[in-house]
Amino acid sequence: MCRSLGLDEGDLAPMDDRDLMGIRADTDFTYDARGRMLRSNEPCEEARRPAPRLFLGRTMAGHVVRVGASAPDALARRLEAIIDRQPPVGDLQAPPAALAALREALARHAPITAEGGGPAYRFPASIAQPGEVVQLTDANRALVRETYPWLYDELADWQPCFAVVRDGEAVAVCFSSRSGADAAEAGVDTLPAFRGRGHAAAVTAAWGAAIRASGRIPLYSTAWENLASRGVARRVGLIRFGADTTLA
């Protein structure tokens, strides 16, 4: 038996997909006074790593661009000009039309060391939360001591956290991999022996409902090649609102 959790559409502030992508970019990175990306925005500062030199978020409503702090001003202007000339997005899964030009501009400054991208999702208005999911707190964090020892040590940083428990141990968890004032992004993991049983979808739904109940927007993203993670999004009923490309 599942219970319906979440806000009615009428309770949500008017926002298009480009606005939502902007909130996601603001949530996923830290910034300097110029609005340039510095580091990834994990709740635990020790887990943060240097931001890419370029984040391009694409939606049917328009683009969102963030440039890394290491990029010279002239390069930042060049990247933004290239993206401004892109045609409207017709297929989110297709590479950006300007990808080759962006690579060339970045490579003139420094070699490209990493490239990534994938879909970004929002949660539906009503989120069904399976009753078997357990919220992790200080009182029961022993559930992750053996299976997720890093989470046992850092539980307070990654809240809210939810788990599916088998034989007294957490076998799947969802936590806040990024956390901001307006939104949070899901991080999900299932032990290999327990994959393919719907546990990841269950904990993700519970996490999304909790973030929404806190007055923030729950978000989920993954890489195009991560078919298992995209499958979780389908099972939870998440709605793809955009896609991103990152170049470091």
Give, region by region, the residue ranges found by the protein language model.
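Residue-level detector of high-confidence beta-strand sites
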Residues: 173, 241-243
